[in-house]
């Protein structure tokens, strides 16, 4: 099988040296992502495209899907590469490829040509289009908005029959810009802002401030791992978790009610800046949107920024909530965000929307900054690739089974779309569907006399959810890995 990778247009307008660097980085990223599917595949870069050739036909759909999620790719073409002798030979090969698709449809032919030939692209379009129109009685030519566009590419003595075109996510290849640290909470905003910086070519590390126990951290780990695995797995990134409960306790005890929200955000920026400096990261990323909550007014945002010299990027600053939720739905983080455990330990009864710098600084004089230094020093830093392994260690008390007993039921916790695409059927045992984002509210409604074997494709989500359910007191939970 063969895929032609078309570059994001902004890459093609760069200077020659920058363009070559971007293409080289994108080629490496593609290799890093696809080696998990087929170690023998070949990735070859050219000036205006990248070729991917693989032998394992069983991995075709997986490879195609992975390519559409790699930043820097505008679209991909799935092609059949064949030799040709003349223009009539091109027509015959196009007829064999497209006959069934064109029956009863309107169509047009579009040709791109590279190399020296005795014919032009327009001449090929007319010849092939006329031939298809004559040989397929139910088809007719329509040059504007046809049902089917027959895409052909002629390169020297090779004909590329384009079997399908699939849109990528665009943007710049990860690694072409510098690293950033995303302050991730697991909600709609931080997930979308992290994705937007990945799409713009940044390697995104994650910093999580734990305000409320293990359940919240488990949920945020799921989001971070999902984002990395789906859009950024070409690079290693860090997941840094900071236990912020001591800081929250100090704020509740020492800070005036109306100033708590701004002070908490300033403490988070201070802590994140220390982490960024430790690992040589150039900027922080937050999901703040102007006016969304009391701490996100211009006055308050300026005061929050003042505590650090580190650049703070806010890609969602002008977005409304509906737009953010729509983006979360597109990238697949909406279900995580809707069911994310929330912690409301620092909510002022009357938060200020226009904090005064002198007053904020006076409140912070009462704060014991050694507490902040201590929690940063004790921060848990893991390679995001190890989250699955670490989760496996943490849920060692949750048994992993490959078979099943008479009282066991397999619980498929994949999303509804994944279940529809690839239904799970296991002979000799019942399979019940309950998407992971409904477990926290619906698992208790299931028959608790049964033993539930949680299953997902890779096993990461099932282990995380098993740990969560165990913490909620459910002992009838195991992880199913056939």
Swiss-Prot record:
Catalytic activity line of the entry: [ThiI sulfur-carrier protein]-S-sulfanyl-L-cysteine + a uridine in tRNA + 2 reduced [2Fe-2S]-[ferredoxin] + ATP + H(+) = [ThiI sulfur-carrier protein]-L-cysteine + a 4-thiouridine in tRNA + 2 oxidized [2Fe-2S]-[ferredoxin] + AMP + diphosphate; [ThiS sulfur-carrier protein]-C-terminal Gly-Gly-AMP + S-sulfanyl-L-cysteinyl-[cysteine desulfurase] + AH2 = [ThiS sulfur-carrier protein]-C-terminal-Gly-aminoethanethioate + L-cysteinyl-[cysteine desulfurase] + A + AMP + 2 H(+)
Principal localisation: cytoplasm
Active site residues of this protein: 456
UniProt entry tagged with the keyword RNA-binding: yes
A biological process term (GO) from this entry: thiamine biosynthetic process
Domain of life: Bacteria
Subcellular location: Cytoplasm
UniProt keyword annotations, A-Z: ATP-binding, Cytoplasm, Disulfide bond, Nucleotide-binding, Redox-active center, RNA-binding, Thiamine biosynthesis, Transferase, tRNA-binding
THUMP domain mapped to chain residues: 61-165
Boundaries of every Rhodanese domain copy: 404-482
Disulfide bridge partners, by residue number: 344-456
Database matches in SMART domains: THUMP
EC number(s) from the headed UniProt entry: 2.8.1.4
InterPro entries per UniProt: Rhodanese-like_dom, Rhodanese-like_dom_sf, Rossmann-like_a/b/a_fold, ThiI_AANH, ThiI_fer, ThiI_N, THII_Thiazole_biosynth_dom, THUMP_dom
Binding-site list for ATP: 183-184, 265, 287, 296
GO terms assigned for molecular function: ATP binding; CCA tRNA nucleotidyltransferase activity; tRNA binding; tRNA-uracil-4 sulfurtransferase activity
Protein family per UniProt: Belongs to the ThiI family.
Stored HAMAP family: ThiI (MF_00021)
Protein name: tRNA sulfurtransferase
Gene this chain is encoded by: thiI
């Amino acid at each position: 099988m063969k895929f032609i990778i078309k570059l994001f247009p902004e890459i093609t307008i760069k200077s020659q040296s920058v363009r070559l660097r971007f293409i080289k980085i994108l080629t490496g990223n593609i290799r890093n992502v696809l080696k998990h599917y087929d170690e023998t595949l070949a990735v070859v870069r050219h000036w205006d495209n990248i070729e991917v050739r693989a032998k394992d036909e069983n991995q075709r759909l997986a490879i195609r899907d992975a390519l559409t999620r790699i930043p820097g790719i505008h679209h991909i073409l799935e092609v059949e590469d064949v030799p040709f002798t003349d223009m009539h030979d091109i027509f015959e090969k196009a007829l064999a490829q497209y006959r069934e698709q064109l029956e009863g449809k309107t169509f047009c032919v579009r040709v791109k040509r590279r190399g020296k030939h005795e014919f032009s692209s327009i001449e090929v379009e007319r010849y092939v289009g006329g031939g298809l129109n004559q040989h397929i009685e139910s088809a007719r030519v329509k040059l504007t908005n046809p049902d089917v566009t027959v895409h052909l590419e002629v390169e020297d003595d090779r004909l590329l029959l384009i079997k399908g075109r699939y849109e990528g996510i665009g943007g710049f290849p990860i690694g072409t810009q510098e690293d950033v640290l995303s302050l991730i909470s697991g909600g709609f905003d931080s997930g979308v802002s992290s994705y937007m910086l990945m799409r713009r070519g940044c390697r995104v590390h994650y910093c999580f401030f734990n305000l409320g126990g293990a359940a919240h951290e488990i949920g945020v780990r799921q989001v971070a791992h999902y984002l990395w695995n789906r859009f950024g797995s070409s690079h290693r990134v860090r997941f840094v978790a900071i236990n912020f409960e001591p800081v929250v306790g100090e704020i509740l005890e020492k800070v005036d009610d109306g100033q708590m929200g701004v002070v908490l955000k300033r403490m988070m920026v201070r802590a994140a800046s220390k982490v960024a400096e430790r690992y040589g990261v150039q900027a922080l990323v937050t999901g703040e949107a102007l006016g969304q909550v009391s701490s996100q007014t211009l006055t308050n945002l300026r005061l929050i920024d003042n505590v650090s010299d580190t650049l703070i990027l806010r890609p969602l600053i002008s977005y409304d909530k509906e737009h953010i939720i729509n983006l979360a739905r597109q990238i697949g983080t909406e279900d995580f965000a809707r069911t994310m455990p929330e912690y409301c330990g620092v909510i002022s009864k009357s938060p200020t929307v226009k904090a005064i710098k002198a007053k904020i600084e006076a409140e912070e004089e009462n704060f014991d900054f050694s507490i902040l230094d201590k929690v940063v020093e004790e921060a848990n830093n893991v390679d995001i690739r190890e989250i699955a392994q670490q989760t496996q260690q943490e849920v060692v008390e949750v048994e992993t089974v490959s078979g099943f007993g008479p009282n066991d039921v397999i619980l498929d916790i994949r999303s509804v779309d994944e279940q529809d695409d690839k239904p799970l059927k296991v002979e000799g045992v019942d399979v019940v569907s309950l998407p992971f984002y409904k477990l926290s509210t619906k698992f208790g409604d299931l028959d608790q006399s049964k033993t539930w074997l949680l299953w997902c494709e890779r096993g990461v989500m099932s282990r995380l959810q098993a740990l969560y359910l165990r913490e909620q007191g459910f002992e009838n939970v195991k992880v199913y890995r056939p």
